């Protein structure tokens, strides 16, 4: 499953690998990888594979789920497809409450005591997913965990999720992606080394000259 999804993401250009010409994230971190899972929306076969995979993860790890919650905005469409497949209610959670109208942060119904699974497109530092989890907990929901399409497998993300006491499972990850990219001849040995060094410590730019 991990390598299959990784292959899909590479084929449609949802993930770019540029170890010799790094991207700069909004945080200022230089990165050899850029992930835009919104592109999956434009590929029916890919998004169907993702929805099926997320459903499988939820059934395996969070079988008592009652509500599917998407993170705004990238997780909303995937949450909708998964909730439809599972015949479950769905809501989505904003990064912060609206400044007008009812001032909702949670759109749709997620009631006190209900068991919720969060659908996220990408786990990097875990920040947006944790914000979603906290909003649902404040509303009295029991958050069973998070499922996502892809994770960078960053230690900082793992630590934040553990600190928030929330389980998280991804369809694919950085390790599988770099392995598939190497198998496809998209990166060579030198590039693979740079990618591996970056994941160990993204804040240390020594990987660029590794």
UniProtKB/Swiss-Prot annotation:
Binding of 5-phospho-alpha-D-ribose 1-diphosphate, residues: 94, 98, 100, 120-128
Bilayer-spanning residue ranges: none
Entry's EC annotation: 2.4.2.10
Listed pathway(s): Pyrimidine metabolism; UMP biosynthesis via de novo pathway; UMP from orotate: step 1/2
UniProt: orotate binding residues: 124
Gene Ontology process terms (BP): 'de novo' UMP biosynthetic process; pyrimidine nucleobase biosynthetic process
Keyword Transmembrane helix: no
Catalytic activity entry: orotidine 5'-phosphate + diphosphate = orotate + 5-phospho-alpha-D-ribose 1-diphosphate
Pfam annotation, one family: Pribosyltran
Cofactor(s) listed: Mg(2+)
GO terms of molecular function: magnesium ion binding; orotate phosphoribosyltransferase activity
Record's keyword annotation contains Protease: no
Keywords linked to the UniProt accession: Glycosyltransferase, Magnesium, Pyrimidine biosynthesis, Transferase
Subunit structure comment from the entry: Homodimer.
HAMAP family in UniProt: PyrE
Family (UniProt): Belongs to the purine/pyrimidine phosphoribosyltransferase family. PyrE subfamily.
Protein role: Catalyzes the transfer of a ribosyl phosphate group from 5-phosphoribose 1-diphosphate to orotate, leading to the formation of orotidine monophosphate (OMP).
Protein name: Orotate phosphoribosyltransferase
Organism of this sequence: Bacillus mycoides (strain KBAB4)
